């Protein structure tokens, strides 16, 4: 079997742990690959150079049997984009993390235990979490685990656009706003929360629609996870659709964007995160 490792860039703790993990995994007879950035960082440091395994682009991590993310939620989202349906286990390096459940001091033993379980049974112990697919006329973005944002070219005075939001063909809201955000429960603690959207427990089967500087004062709405959400963007020179804050598509209004549950969920491996314990770190 093959384990992929993606470590947070410019973080010595993450690279040191990645080096240790590479050494331990070799003792289990598992093959190890790291993403190209991690390989470069390990190779540039004398103490870690011997641990450098094969490297591969993050987009090829789906060929692994397990992917390990070491860092924060941003690193996890980056790794998850390439992992596809491959189970992914997140190691949290201390900041508020709602996707990374494993403490660094427990990481090596937890990963080794999961690898041995896969070697013995042929599959990982996982929990499926929905992702979002945003698409338009002849285009679609890579799936988002946290949120999809649709907005005008810029925010603030003189920016934004007219936004019409439909849920399963029924009009929910219409008017001027900076944009609209559609989040999964997993992403409710991220950008959604900063836009005054609600916290939603990750086990709830729903999607969250939150207006961004919405002049209509429309409250956020939680809909069924299988709802189809359509955002019509007009009255703006340009707009943008963003998946998990990283992958973006520039659009020219009028544009009709569909956001719905992606066909392939993310599969979380390892012990589950205690949601309410993680919430304490937000205070």
UniProtKB/Swiss-Prot annotation:
Annotated catalytic residues: 73
Main localization, broad class: cytoplasm
UniProt xrefs under Gene3D superfamilies: Probable inorganic polyphosphate/atp-NAD kinase, domain 1, Probable inorganic polyphosphate/atp-NAD kinase, domain 2
A GO molecular-function annotation: ATP binding
InterPro entries: ATP-NAD_kinase_N, ATP-NAD_kinase_PpnK-typ_C, NAD/diacylglycerol_kinase_sf, NADK
Localization in the cell: Cytoplasm
Cofactor section: a divalent metal cation
Record key words, sorted: ATP-binding, Cytoplasm, Kinase, NAD, NADP, Nucleotide-binding, Transferase
GO CC terms of this entry: cytoplasm
Protein residues bound to NAD(+): 73-74, 146-147, 157, 176, 178, 189-194, 213
Domain of life from the UniProt record: Archaea
EC annotation from Swiss-Prot or TrEMBL: 2.7.1.23
Gene Ontology process terms (BP): NAD metabolic process; NADP biosynthetic process
A Pfam family it matches: NAD_kinase
Transferase is among the record's keywords: yes
Catalytic activity, reaction form: NAD(+) + ATP = ADP + NADP(+) + H(+)
Class of enzymatic activity (EC top level): transferase
Similarity section: Belongs to the NAD kinase family.
Function: Involved in the regulation of the intracellular balance of NAD and NADP, and is a key enzyme in the biosynthesis of NADP. Catalyzes specifically the phosphorylation on 2'-hydroxyl of the adenosine moiety of NAD to yield NADP.
Protein name, UniProt field: NAD kinase
Native organism taxonomy: Archaea, Methanobacteriati, Methanobacteriota, Stenosarchaea group, Halobacteria
Gene (UniProt): nadK
